[in-house]
Amino acid sequence: MAKKDGVIEIEGVVTEALPNAMFRVELTNKHVVLAHISGKMRQHYIRILPEDRVVVELSPYDLTRGRIVYRYK
């Protein structure tokens, strides 16, 4: 996977599944963000459930929203 410039990648745990493929994720630094699934994960039907460990990409412009890019097995 290619690294993107200016993107913050951080691990977290999904705490709640919301409508429209949105999730509330608690990050390792105890912040809570709203995250959606990346397009490739959607394309490959990767399911995300509460209590899953995930990697979230955050934009430096809005640290309250993110994109889930990986789910640990």
From Swiss-Prot:
It is found in: Cytoplasm. The lineage of its organism: Bacteria, Bacillati, Actinomycetota, Actinomycetes, Micrococcales. Residues 1-73 form the S1-like domain. Keywords: Cytoplasm, Initiation factor, Protein biosynthesis, RNA-binding, rRNA-binding. SUPFAM superfamilies: Nucleic acid-binding proteins (SSF50249). Component of the 30S ribosomal translation pre-initiation complex which assembles on the 30S ribosome in the order IF-2 and IF-3, IF-1 and N-formylmethionyl-tRNA(fMet); mRNA recruitment can occur at any time during PIC assembly. It comes from the Bacteria. Belongs to the IF-1 family. This is Translation initiation factor IF-1. It holds the Pfam family eIF-1a. CDD domains: S1_IF1. Its main location: cytoplasm.
